[in-house]
Amino acid sequence: MLNFFAAAPKGFEYSLAQELTEFGATEVKESVAGVYFTASLTLAYRITLWTRLASRIVLVIYKGSCESAEQLYNAAYCVDWPAHFSNKSTFSIDFHGTGGFLNNTQFGALKIKDAIVDRFRDDDIERPNVSRVDAEFKVDAHFRNGVITIAMNFSGPSLHQRGYRSTTGEAPLKENLAANMLVRSGWQASPSTLLDPFCGSGTVLIEAALMAADIAPGLQRSRFGFEHWRRHDKAVWQEIVEEAKARASLGVKRCEIKFYGSDIDSRLVALAKRNAENAGVLELIEFNVADALTIAPPAESGYLITNPPYGERLGNVSELLQLYYQLGDKFKKEFGGWKVAMLCSDIELVSSLKLKADKQMKMFNGALECAFNIYTLHANSTRRDTPVLPDGVDIADIAPAFANRIKKNAKLLEKWAKKEGIDSYRIYDADIPEYNVAVDKYLDYVIIQEYMAPATIPEAVTKRRLSDVLLALPSAIGINPNKMIMKTRERQKGTSQYQKLDERKLELITTEYGAKFKLNLTGYLDTGLFLDHRLTRRLVGQKSKGRRVLNLFSYTGSASVHAALGGAKSVTTVDMSNTYIAWAKDNFALNGLQGKQYEFVQSDCMQWIRDCNEQYDLIFIDPPTFSNSKRMEDSFDVQRDHVNLLSSLVKLLSPTGELVFSNNKRKFKMDIETLTKMNINVTNIDDVTLPMDYKRNPHIHNTWLITHA
């Protein structure tokens, strides 16, 4: 009897152990990401050809304690390598694990390589050559907890590569993962009608058809690891292969199970057909191009087993939440009597089905941890009587308090915005504490920003509430889900609010009191326009006529644009970021503003203030709450440093000049006493700079008008 280890993805151990036991293996023992077992050579061949779950099978040649590099070398040297492979065959070492004396896998592989080469030489045999790519004989070594296991790769290339796949879709499902879905769902034990409405390249259906037609999954593989093993019995292997071919031929003819696959992408359906044809099961599967939400059950009962789109796969989160919710609704209404088994990595999407799972398991799709949930659908079951709206769900069903509030807000603010002459504004700002998000409307798009939840609220609760928000929004405010953009906002430190989120740009032009501004809805956490400063920008414009205007920490220069449109004699725009200076220039161009009177400066604002000798009639400054950018000489804290900052700025202010100072620190306290002693007048103007759409959040910013005493 020979000792083996069958490797598989994490989460497969139980299913794989059962499969090996059914094959007739003995001493079956589950381990991490695999199963140890004992088998005869004949049975090992059969397992290699027929396993649907294992990724790799290795023949254990040596296993023992190892506490030094010398012991590692000796362990490998004691193996009779010339009895295992010819010196004419190339070989390679695949080494895994570190610890103790061994902190480098490359060193471990080198020690074993040296031992193998020395063993050949000491037996007066010319040494074999190492090949890092496509070696003919592969040694697999694992070091863990002071134990070294040296094995031969018995199966060869990964066993999930059946040989029928021509190319893959955007998000391919590994064949052995599809097989495990079929096993754990219960379908393999009692096969019946099978439907996959997101079939992609057809993997789930093809694996199921191979099972039902008694076709060995390894029958089309062209290479196996044991082919260059000296103890390989070609006659026995060939006999097992011929037997499998005969069973396959008979199995296809006898198979009476019906398989149905569909996908909305016609290219993937064509690919699925090619793969099924390559696997020899095309005649068993009916493929169609169809939307999963429109298909009808092909039988009164059966299994719906699928791997639908999710975050790491395809689609944006808002659309996916809508899709999952409507899928759950369809399953409940139309698939009574069916079992549904679904693989998904996103708990929010799974919860949006609004179905109660009979079983919940973990599986890994590559390195990605996924939930595999099984649902039993009962006949004549409905979730509700009210219909699903075309672009979303019934608002009475999901987060009614949130839905009703934002619907009311949107209706009120839409009329106000038209009257104001703006098309970008906030329609919800954590009005209801349980739904801790801000929702901003930019033309016909909305951005949803999730605030960091208190640590006392369980993550599962916050995720469920967020998914309910995203589900309720489309019908509540009449927006297409594909025009919803989700962002997560936390407390910003330093320049984190300006870090890029997405290389892809979704750019729009928004209008504000006659000014035009370029927006980037996806590139950064912020869009290029701070909506809460809308009235402050207008105030700057109203105060600018005939004046020399300075805008510091200018961001994208929107206040500078208002100043220029307001008739400023000159406008100087200063920001540390080249990106935002370029953006400010774009905004000026959008408004037809050009000329030498408009100056753009890329510089550390604090240093620029210290170096400046000019005088200005109007200064606007909206500094960050805190910054420690590498480009700045010192860190900046608006609470700590505002007195020094304002006293320096007043020196640049003409005798009749005005300084508009704003910041977003919620608990900011202006040191009026110290500034008054410095002959500086300070007046809070929050009441005239807080827009209507931010009245629900009066602490969003604070604004001050500062002059010489």
Swiss-Prot record:
Q: What class of enzyme is it?
A: transferase
All copies of domain THUMP, residue ranges:
43-154
**Name of one Pfam family that matches:** Methyltrans_SAM
Q: What is its EC number?
A: 2.1.1.173, 2.1.1.264
Top-level taxon of the source organism = Bacteria
User: Main subcellular localization, coarse class?
Assistant: cytoplasm
Catalyses which reaction(s): guanosine(2445) in 23S rRNA + S-adenosyl-L-methionine = N(2)-methylguanosine(2445) in 23S rRNA + S-adenosyl-L-homocysteine + H(+); guanosine(2069) in 23S rRNA + S-adenosyl-L-methionine = N(2)-methylguanosine(2069) in 23S rRNA + S-adenosyl-L-homocysteine + H(+)
Q: What is the lineage of its organism?
A: Bacteria, Pseudomonadati, Pseudomonadota, Gammaproteobacteria, Alteromonadales
Tell me, what is one Gene Ontology molecular-function annotation carried by this entry? 23S rRNA (guanine(2445)-N(2))-methyltransferase activity
Keywords attached to this entry:
Cytoplasm, Methyltransferase, RNA-binding, rRNA processing, S-adenosyl-L-methionine, Transferase
- InterPro entries from the entry? 23SrRNA_methyltr_KL (IPR017244), DNA_methylase_N6_adenine_CS (IPR002052), RlmKL-like_Mtase (IPR000241), RlmKL-like_Mtase_CS (IPR053943), RlmL_1st (IPR054170), SAM-dep_methyl-trfase (IPR019614), SAM-dependent_MTases_sf (IPR029063), THUMP_dom (IPR004114)
Q: Which Gene3D superfamilies match?
A: 3.30.2130.30, RNA methyltransferase domain (HRMD) like, Vaccinia Virus protein VP39
Return the GO cellular component terms, semicolon-separated: cytoplasm
Q: Which PANTHER family match?
A: RIBOSOMAL RNA LARGE SUBUNIT METHYLTRANSFERASE K/L, RIBOSOMAL RNA LARGE SUBUNIT METHYLTRANSFERASE K_L
Spell out the subcellular localization from the entry.
Cytoplasm
Briefly state the protein's biological role.
Answer: Specifically methylates the guanine in position 2445 (m2G2445) and the guanine in position 2069 (m7G2069) of 23S rRNA.
What organism is this sequence from?
Shewanella baltica (strain OS155 / ATCC BAA-1091)
Q: What is the official name of this protein in its record?
A: Ribosomal RNA large subunit methyltransferase K/L
The entry assigns this protein to a family as follows: Belongs to the methyltransferase superfamily. RlmKL family.
